[in-house]
């Protein structure tokens, strides 16, 4: 609709986070650009959850909002296979149940073999600030109209969702000295498995808190809040509530944490993470000035809530193609998700599968045991969603296999088989695999003398050695790392110095957790037996013994495999057994 806002970050100027960082690395492993752009434009990097096990470690970058969009535009324009056209699409060209192109607001018909809808929050979007309603897709941009009405007419089930964004403030008016400082990691990490530059300097974020006075001021606007008066019909994100929602739901809390995040290198604009609101702007402003550090704050623009249309993702195949209209794909918030990362993953998968569809090839489907992207799409297609869906590590039952450090070894070989240009990434995967073999062999074969390691063991609260022991056995102890051996044993340091730090880190995780990883892989093998049993178009009403709910859900969703069927809400183990008997015939 507007080429000047391509890749504009609508909300938080950040990429990654818990489970989201894993998705960004998976996109990169599959040949996507998200991680590359993030590495080139971030102002701070942090690895979250380092106090927990490696399955929970999640990279997060604070981004330069303006540079992020600029870098994306440059990369897209550098691709000769991408064409651009600035206009609003108001309808689809559909003939005999097959999409043939799109129709624009100027009346142009653009033919296409496949169409992917990635409408974000723009479908009949309405911004709410207090008692005011504004038709918009986001601040300063018009809403998209026409598509929802046509899709509903074609038989699609539509719904409304809501999200919000906080006020932006002038960083020059803040008292940074009274806030907690949050520095980035040293050494600095990155997202992409390609040769992107590492950040040489970082900008800090800050932390402050609301208080009782802030809450009292905010409450004075509740009678004008569209959320409490019923003007907002859409359901908001459970895990990213507005400040008024937090005060209402957690009335026993005297304060709520706020992250004060710079929007870039060369701007004074600041994003107040945790202060999302749709209250009248004067209430937002008055309350904000009671936050420590914000006593003299000037607001650039108030926070707002936005309502928009979405379509139940149970209307999609696992390829993200719609069941009702052939060659039509949905990706992003139109499917009920929230977040840049979830949307980017769906866009990549929809794009891959649209290409495969045109070329009469089987769709590319990632299993739950292969990627967070697989978990995301499987959840959406099989369970649907009644609220904006956000990815968490807890949603992935095989998360010890789906770590951020091994996204490349999991997915890059699959991307290569599809014909995606991942030559450099694949060469690095081979190098990483070879490094692991050498490191594992060295650690299993090297014996350590007590005198070389006992001091560090004592410092770590671990029992000293009685006799020399294989390095591998010592490494299995809690709080012991390869770096501990490098510090005290020159031959270990000399050997490890030939490898990249990331390769060493990945090898260490694989060695320390190899027992858990082996058990998880055995479990996956059992589950995959069901994933490999295909289900073709079946009238489930003809299968005796299935529950009425199972017949209804299976006929509606038409799962591709027994495994997919088993994850549909309402399908019992007894129903799965009946399906196995039926398919066996």
Task: Name every feature range the model reports, one short phrase each.
Residues 1-91, 106, 118-135, 142, ...:
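Conserved N-terminal/central alpha/beta ligand/cofactor-binding core
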Residues 2-3, 20, 149-285, 293, ...:
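An anion/pyrophosphate-binding glycine-rich loop and adjacent beta-alpha core
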Residues 27, 343-364:
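Internal hydrophobic alpha-helix adjacent to the cofactor/substrate pocket in enzyme cavities
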Residues 105-114:
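Core beta-strand elements of the Rossmann-like FAD/NAD(P) dinucleotide-binding domain
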Residues 114, 119-123, 279-280, 292:
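Glycine-/small-residue-rich beta->alpha transition segments that form the dinucleotide
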Residues 265, 271-337, 365-378, 500-553, ...:
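A glycine-rich dinucleotide-binding beta-alpha-beta segment and adjacent secondary-structure elements
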Residues 333-341, 397-399:
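Glycine-rich phosphate/pyrophosphate-binding beta-alpha loops
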Residues 395, 401, 412-577, 581-585:
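Extended, charge-enriched "interface" segments that sit outside catalytic cores
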């Amino acid at each position: 609709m507007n080429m000047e806002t391509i890749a504009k970050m609508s909300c938080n100027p950040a990429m990654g986070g818990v489970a989201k960082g894993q998705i960004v690395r998976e996109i990169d492993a599959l040949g996507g650009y998200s991680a590359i752009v993030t590495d080139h434009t971030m102002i701070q990097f942090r690895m979250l959850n380092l106090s927990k096990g490696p399955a929970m470690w999640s990279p997060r970058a604070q981004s330069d909002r303006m540079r992020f969009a600029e870098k994306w535009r440059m990369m897209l324009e550098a691709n000769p296979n991408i064409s651009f056209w600035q206009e609003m699409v108001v309808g689809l060209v559909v003939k005999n149940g097959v999409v043939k192109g799109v129709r624009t607001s100027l009346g142009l018909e653009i033919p296409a073999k496949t169409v992917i809808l990635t409408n974000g929050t723009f479908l009949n979007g309405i911004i709410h600030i207090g008692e005011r309603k504004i038709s918009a897709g986001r601040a300063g941009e018009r809403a998209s109209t026409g598509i929802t009405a046509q899709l509903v007419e074609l038989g699609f089930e539509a719904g409304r969702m809501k999200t919000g964004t906080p006020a932006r403030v002038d960083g020059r008016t803040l008292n940074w000295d009274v806030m907690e400082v949050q520095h980035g990691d040293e050494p600095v990490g990155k997202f992409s498995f390609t040769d992107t530059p590492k950040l040489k300097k970082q900008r800090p974020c800050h932390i402050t808190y609301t208080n009782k006075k802030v809450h009292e001021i905010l409450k004075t606007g509740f009678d004008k809040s569209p959320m409490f008066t019923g003007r907002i019909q859409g359901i908001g994100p459970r895990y990213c509530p507005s400040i008024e929602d937090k005060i209402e739901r957690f009335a026993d809390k005297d304060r709520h944490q706020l992250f004060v995040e710079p929007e870039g290198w060369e701007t004074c604009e600041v994003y107040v993470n945790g202060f999302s609101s749709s209250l009248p702007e004067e209430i937002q402003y008055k309350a904000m000035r009671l936050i420590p550090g914000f006593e003299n704050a000037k607001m650039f623009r108030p926070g707002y809530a936005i309502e928009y249309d979405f379509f139940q993702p149970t209307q999609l195949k696992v390829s993200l193609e719609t069941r009702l209209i052939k060659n039509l794909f949905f990706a992003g918030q139109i499917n009920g998700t929230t977040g840049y990362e979830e949307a980017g993953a769906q866009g990549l998968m929809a794009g891959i599968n649209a290409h495969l569809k045109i070329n009469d090839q089987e769709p590319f489907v990632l299993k739950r045991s292969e990627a967070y992207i697989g978990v995301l799409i499987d959840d959406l297609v099989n369970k649907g969603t009644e609220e904006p869906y956000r990815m968490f590590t807890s949603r992935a039952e095989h998360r010890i296999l789906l770590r951020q450090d091994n996204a490349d070894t999991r997915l890059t070989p699959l991307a290569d088989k599809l014909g995606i240009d991942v030559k450099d990434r694949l060469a690095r995967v081979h190098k990483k695999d070879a490094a692991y073999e050498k490191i594992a062999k060295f650690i299993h074969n090297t014996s350590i003398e007590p005198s070389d390691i006992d001091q560090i063991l004592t410092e770590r609260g671990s029992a000293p050695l009685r006799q020399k022991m294989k390095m591998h056995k010592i490494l299995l102890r809690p709080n012991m790392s390869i770096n501990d051996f490098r510090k005290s044993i020159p031959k270990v340091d000399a050997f490890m110095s030939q490898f990249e730090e990331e390769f060493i880190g990945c090898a260490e995780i694989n060695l320390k957790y190899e027992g858990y990883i082996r058990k998880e892989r055995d479990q996956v093998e059992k589950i995959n037996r069901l994933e490999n049993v295909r289900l073709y178009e079946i009238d489930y009403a003809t299968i005796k013994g299935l529950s009425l709910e199972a017949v209804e859900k299976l006929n509606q969703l038409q799962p591709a495999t027994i495994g997919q069927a088993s994850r549909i809400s309402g399908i019992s183990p007894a129903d799965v057994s009946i399906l196995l008997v039926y398919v066996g015939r």
